[in-house]
């Protein structure tokens, strides 16, 4: 059974998805969650706090999907492919959450949310680096910063996903996965790198 807090977060996500952050009201969120005024304010001081909490929970779920997609057994090319698949699969399978994370979320939600976001982003970087660092050391991935590496892999896929989330592009972003993987591999994988760790090219 879901808790009152989970019901409010789910209701908030649905209302933000339909009306945007500005158009959403506490009354509408409460009504959808069948929650009293007292119940809402027991968990959240404002619509903004609920939105910030929702943002961090969705961010954690997205990051968990990304980190779990790669492990020490993946070679450079396979790992890149898995990360792109993980990103596209998560966005398509969690369209409402992805729209909130990438389209609706706001930078002005406060320092508390931004601080927690930085911590989450560091966790993502650390998780990917556990897979990437040995490949870098062996020369199987091209040398570049973690930020540049991630932007080369996820940036192009994310442009496709945002066009789909906003309705500008109707096709499933996963239809382009092979091209996105091929482009990312050219950008970050050293020529001749083996597909799997310990394998041969």
Question: Language model features by range: what are they?
Answer:
Residues 60-63, 111-138, 147-151, 159, ...:
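Amphipathic alpha-helical packing segments from all-alpha helical-bundle domains
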């Amino acid at each position: 059974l879901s808790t009152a807090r989970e019901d409010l977060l789910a209701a908030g996500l649905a209302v933000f998805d339909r009306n945007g952050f500005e158009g959403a009201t506490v009354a509408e969120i409460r009504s959808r969650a069948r929650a009293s005024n007292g119940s809402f304010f027991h968990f959240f001081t404002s619509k903004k706090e609920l939105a910030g909490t929702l943002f961090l929970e969705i961010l954690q779920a997205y990051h968990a999907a990304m980190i779990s997609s790669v492990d020490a057994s993946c070679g450079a090319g396979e790992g890149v492919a898995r990360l792109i698949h993980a990103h596209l699969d998560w966005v398509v399978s969690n369209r409402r959450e992805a729209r909130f994370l990438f389209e609706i979320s706001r930078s002005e939600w406060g320092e508390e949310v931004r601080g927690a976001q930085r911590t989450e982003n560091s966790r993502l970087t650390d998780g990917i680096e556990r897979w990437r660092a040995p490949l870098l050391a062996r020369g199987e991935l091209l040398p570049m910063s973690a930020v540049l590496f991630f932007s080369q892999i996820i940036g192009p896929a994310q442009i496709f996903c945002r066009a789909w989330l906003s309705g500008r592009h109707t096709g499933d972003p996963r239809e382009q996965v092979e091209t996105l993987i091929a482009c990312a591999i050219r950008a970050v994988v050293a020529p001749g790198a083996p597909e799997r760790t310990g394998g041969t090219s």
